[in-house]
Amino acid sequence: MKYDFSFLSVSAFGEAAEYACELFSEEIELRAGYRPFENGEPCIELVCDDSIADKDSFVIEQDGSHLIIKAQGIRGLIYGYSYFLRKCVFSSNKITLIKNISGNYSPDKKIRGHQCGYRSTPNTYDAWGPEEYFRFYRDIMAFGCNICEHIPSGGKDENNPLMKYHPLEVAVWASELADKLDMDVSCWYPNDDKEDEESALASRRKVFEAMPRIDAIFPPGGDPGEMDGDDFIKRCIKISDTLKSIKPDAQMWPSAQAPHSNITWPEDFLSEMNKLPEEIDGIITGPNHAFMMDDLRRKLPSKYPIRFYPDITHNVRCEYPVHFDRDDWHYAFASTLSRESVNPRPTEFRLLHRLTRPYVVGSVSYSEGASDDVNKAVWSDMDYFPDVSLYETLCDYARFFLWQADASNIADGILGLEKNWEGDPAENPHIEHTLRIFEAELEKAPSLMENWRFVLLLFRARCDVLVYRRRRFELELIDEAKNFASRGDFALARAELMTDYDADYYVLRASLGQLADILFEQIGIQLDVENYHAAGWERGATLDTIDLPVTDRAWLINRFEASDAMPEGEREAFLTRVFNRNKINSGEYYFSLAEHGFGVLGERQRGEFYIDYQGDRREVNNGSIPMCMLKAFDNYTFVCKLAGFEPDTDYKLRVTFKKTKNDMFNTFYIKANGKDIYRGKFYGGEKDEQFEREMLQERFTCAVYDLPASVFENGCIALEIGEEHVGVVLSEFKIYKA
């Protein structure tokens, strides 16, 4: 049943309720164009009630178009009226509540929030002032947040042209604004291992005294930080004493994030925590974690709760890359959209939330700006309502933030954006459909262009289509060029590769710049370095990466240019090798992580590996490298099980490595069916100088090893490549007949 709340009245009972009434009235005016009345029906009452269980809970009593929202104070009342708004449809002057929302509401998790630090590296926050931060607090509270996290010290970061304030100045007035809403304030405050204890305590004392509200301090153990694990906890204990002498109710939450350089950090950390220091209130885990989450919970004394620090903002080179459970995000998107693009990933983060929920008391996400806005709402809603339907959350997101649009269509569009990133974009016509969803909503409601959240989603949808169209077009050119090359007509092959895009492509590309201008004015998001002062190309500067190669077209053109100075006969032989770079004969095998993914390897990789993605680096993906080399697998071991090799035949194994070898160690090895093929210094084997010179970019090298017929078992081989200290970094290999 639906309920008409058009031209509603609002009344308040209690001091906090009066302030909540003012905030609620502003929300109604923003959506309906008028403020609520003081008397009459329909009616909503906001009531302060000390009998409510805690300040994070609220009660809604509904009788038709008469609603009573009860809470202890301002926090719960904001949750209550926001929940009402999440279930309302606004159409012109009409307000329709879509269902009865009576109930007692309490959160699943104690800690629910997001980081919003003011420094030079975020893609949005550095452009904000008090008005934007206050709006942000209200928006995240609409989905149940009770804490924000600031960064009071800029550290080594320098202010950029967008920053109007000093980070500490922001921390002061931002914490004051948060306090008005009874929102907890956490501070991410790293230790400097070069700073002596006296200086560290003195500098922090000034911050603690300056900020009106501090509820928690989060010193990361690493990323950044290089202190030993035991020294780190001892320093945190001292800081905690200083903190609590100024803010008695504030808590100390160090993180179990370890410096890469310190292999004993986890044990040193635990040795201090096992002494049960009273000054430590809980432990945080996040990127560069010293322990897997279940291992941390098993080993950490039970008196210490764990707070999660989920990275919901990054796509590659991070703790939870796109498709983190299989790490197969296609290089066409990874190159062009890069590490910090607009990234709604609702189903992925629902999975992550379900995996981590049993271990933690809550979370404060790692965020660098507006690009992860959908993820914030999804994560927070699950922290409050763990069993909520994901589709319902997305419809709530649309009704609350994009009230001009059809909520179900926006929810479908957001899910569509996530589905756009499945598989090879050239094989995903769904990408065009997703864009049509947003374009259709814009046609029905042009005022959506005034809503930054809609423009952000539209921007992403158009980016995806641009990549889809470019990759499809270029793959067709490459197929034709290969046909010409196979007949020896390299001039026609080259001409085919030089074919330009059509006019529609350039219109679509230009629209991205237009949307970027709008978004910069609306929310301050920085979509390139030159025009909007992004901190760098991987800091959400999508316009600086969107045009990077998504096929081998640029590399093939580069190879044609390299052949221009060669004699004709040599030139043709060279170009033939270029076009046949990855070609294999019957009974041979070629593997590229970028082109083929892990699924073809017949065995799961061991431990926590890292993909050192190269494709969004303009100095790498500039025509000097084929797509097959863009993903570099970084781990202590690489394993695979292969078959189909011919009996009684000797083979060669050629592996392409990233140039990260370390001559300190002689423990690099390659095994085939358990037998040592090579063991010694990096990388051993023989050099294939011609292949390296003609086919590899300068960051890579290759080595060739013998695979005698005796190591194969009925045409099968299990390969293991590894090194126990620093690991190996490889991108491709080929097994071919000797």
Task: Give residue ranges: language-model regions.
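Catalytic-core regions of glycoside hydrolase
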Residues: 89-93, 146, 157-175, 179-406, ...
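Structural motif
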Residues: 9-15, 46-50, 70-72, 118, ...
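C-terminal non-catalytic alpha-helical accessory regions
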Residues: 367-375, 386-585
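Short, well-ordered secondary-structure micro-motifs within conserved domains or adaptor modules
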Residues: 34-56
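Extracytoplasmic
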Residues: 564-738
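Generic recognition of long tandem-repeat/solenoid scaffolds
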Residues: 67-71, 97, 452-463, 630, ...
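Extracellular/lumenal ectodomain signal focusing on beta-strand-rich modules
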Residues: 113, 216, 282, 644, ...
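Feature activates predominantly on carbohydrate-active enzymes
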Residues: 2-6, 10-31, 51-199, 209-213, ...
